[in-house]
Amino acid sequence: MDVSNSTPVNSPATIARVWYSDKMDIPIINDSHILSFILVDHETVVQHVADDHDDIEVVSALAVAATNFSKMNDGLDTAIVHRKHSMLYYITTLALAFRLDTSIFDVIHTTVTIGDLVPTVERVPTADAVPAVYPAMAPVSPESNRDTMVQSVAVTTKEHIRRPRNQFIIYRQWMSARLHEDNPGLTAGAISSIVAKAWKGETPQVKAHFKALAVEEDRKHKLAYPGYRYQARRTRNERRKLFSTIKAVSQYPVPVTNPVLQYPVQATSSLTTADLNDPVMNLGSLNN
């Protein structure tokens, strides 16, 4: 998708949606269950059959489920997605949600915050490149200068490359989906405890199966990201500090020191969509 002329507006979800979509679909589970679980590209997706098309009601109804889903996935940001012209809604990781086909799905809710977004700004290098509507000696009011500073921290998403999962993480996501389906009332803590005990008691053959999946995922990851180095995500406090800084800039005018530099700031992004094309998990032999 060509995003060179895209102008991100509205919410952070809208921004990420423009850059990440690569026309993925989610299989439909045709049954009467309110909640069903689907494996999509090695990730668990929760399907919900709603009573009506009220997105606000659906988000409210799925709030607890979305929170537990995030805990099951190491605290990753999540999204609630609506399949257009249907009563089907999905809880997915944020990364997967923004890879879905925008002609089929709408992202109606995310847990992403402005603190997860990184400002990247490109300024025009010389006065000759300044647009004519901003002549060199044009007066600039403190109010308009403040708006320019707010634009200078215009949010653009930074692609987050996930680490390849180890054998236990793959097992945990698979087993958690089965437990949720059979016991929808279980808490995330109870599920984590059950999964840990189950993994400890699994046979070497079962563990070898998931080890093979992890090795294959690691191989695909190295091919897709040859220069990848793991970097810890921002802590909650770091995100809160960044948000406070952006909020402070938006509230106070900045003195004008060089009118030549007062011009619209354009955000740029080097984001590319990466698809590992992971093989579908062959778990048929484990379905007892």
Swiss-Prot record:
DNA-binding region: 161-229
A biological process from GO: negative regulation of transcription by RNA polymerase II
Gene3D superfamilies given in the database record: High mobility group box domain
Keyword Transcription among UniProt keywords: yes
GO function terms (MF aspect): DNA-binding transcription activator activity, RNA polymerase II-specific; RNA polymerase II cis-regulatory region sequence-specific DNA binding
Keywords of this entry: DNA-binding, Fertilization, Nucleus, Transcription
Subcellular location: Nucleus
GO cellular-component term (any): nucleus
Major subcellular location class: nucleus
Function: Transcription factor that is required for post-fertilization events. It is required for the developmental events that occur in the female organ after fertilization.
Name used for this protein in its record: Sporulation minus regulator 2
